[in-house]
Each structure stands twice: as C-alpha cells, then as structure tokens.
Amino acid sequence: LEVAKAACSAGASYLGVATVDEGIELREAGMREPILILSQPPAEAIPLLLYYQIRPAVYTSEFAIAYAEAADAQGIKAPYHLAINSGMNRIGVRFNNVVEFLSQVSFHRALELEGCFTHFATADSLETLDFQIQINHFVEAMRAVEAAGINPGIVHCDNSAATYRFPKTNFDMVRLGIAMYGYQPAP
C-alpha cells in the first residue's frame, strides 16, 4: 500500500498487482488509479473485479465471455488487458494467435480492450537472444493487431530490468517491480 501511494504521488497513473486481494486492498485504501491484475484471475473473482473496478489480464475466451456477460448484466463495461505469450510460456494468448483471439471475443459489446502486454522471461539475463526473440514476437503481435484495425490500447511489457536495459521497449507504460524497492535488477 505504501509503495502504491508513493508511486502515485511520484506520478504513476496506473497500478499493477498480482492478486485480486491486492487490488481490493488498494481500492479499500482509497486508491483511485486504474488497477491491473497481471494474470487472469479465476472466474469466481469476476464479481469482485467489477465491484472494485479492477482490470484483469485476459487470455482465455471462456473468461473473457464470462467477464463480459457479468458486466453487461450490470450495464457496465468490462475493461481488460490482453496477456500475450511471447515466449515466457506461463500465461497469455500465443503471439501469433492474438488477432484470431480478439476476433473470437470482440463481438461482446461490454468487452473493452484497454491494453496489451507480455512478460519477459530473460530481460535480466546477460544473454539477450531470448529477450530479442520475445520482443520481436510481441512487436509482431502488435503490428498484426493494428493491421486488423484494432486499437491495442496501452502497450506495455517492460519489467524493471527491461526498463533500464532496453529503453526502446518501454512503449506506453513500464511495470517496475524490484526497482521500486531500490534494488538494481540483474545483471
């Protein structure tokens, strides 16, 4: 909570969290900035996401539709950020399937694509080949989205290490983690 307050007082206009509970804690403490959960929460959390206005990462059509239907039933929008798998292979729509995924879920009027992002597996590694492959995959996905006439919203991918080491990949927003606590990301 204190880190979020300090970040916002220093100019941060968006907050990222790992869990729904962390997002709720920030809302209940009076934080008004948009809050993004950096992974897709379980469907059971959808009512809480809508009530507390917390944006989820989305990468399955089942979750996207359930989220949209719940929002539509309340007459509100369902803003989300699309998680793109560019090579970390934990979460996300595979980079070469992004446009297909968006076409499968975009019919729902409540869904509102607010951003697109990926997670880097090796931005803190001395060896940069895997990082370069990931960034190329992510850029390829963003070009495909734009070529399809879809506004990707806020484009973001940089963690602490990438923010410092690869400033050309900062795009619209960076997601500092360890650097916010005064630590230098490896190497």
Segments from the language model and where they lie:
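Active-site loop/helix belt of alpha/beta enzymes
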Residues: 1-10, 68-71, 77-78, 86-187
